[in-house]
């Protein structure tokens, strides 16, 4: 699931199409609800999704975790599926023109958060929980 406007950049468009991703028009509530429902059904049927709940990519973010958009977790809530936080370290360097040599990016899959753990939480609380776990992992490594 990606912002429609940003999904048409070089390489990104190809990846979104290859992975059969969804393009989200940020200010279109009706379309957002449709995508949440589609993603929920896809997930129930076994399809995996990668979400970047920060809602965008900050250039040269230096491994800072920005605020998460609570709506990013609505599909998981609706589908009653686990949320697997993933901490990315140094991924920003790939998109930063200051780094012209090979980049090593770390990908850390954290413990899943099962539906039973988050079922009584609001989506904003889930967003904070996931963000905190990712930030804790990044802080423990850097």
Summary of predicted features, one role per range:
Residues 1-29:
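Catalytic core of membrane glycerolipid acyltransferases/transacylases, capturing the structured
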Residues 35-142:
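Non-catalytic C-terminal accessory region of glycerolipid acyltransferases
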Residues 32:
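Glycine-rich anion/phosphate-binding loops
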């Amino acid at each position: 699931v990606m912002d429609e406007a940003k999904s048409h950049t070089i390489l990104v468009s190809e990846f979104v199409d290859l992975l059969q991703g969804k393009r989200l028009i940020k200010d279109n509530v009706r379309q957002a609800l449709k995508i949440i429902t589609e993603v929920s059904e896809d997930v129930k049927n076994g399809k995996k999704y990668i979400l970047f709940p920060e809602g965008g990519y900050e250039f040269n973010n230096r491994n800072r975790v920005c605020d998460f958009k609570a709506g990013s977790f609505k599909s998981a809530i609706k589908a009653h599926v686990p949320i697997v936080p993933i901490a990315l370290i140094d991924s920003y360097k790939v998109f930063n023109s200051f780094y012209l040599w090979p980049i090593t990016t770390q990908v850390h899959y954290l413990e899943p958060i099962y539906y039973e753990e988050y079922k009584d939480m609001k989506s904003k609380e889930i967003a904070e929980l996931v963000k905190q776990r990712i930030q804790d992992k990044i802080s423990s490594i850097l």
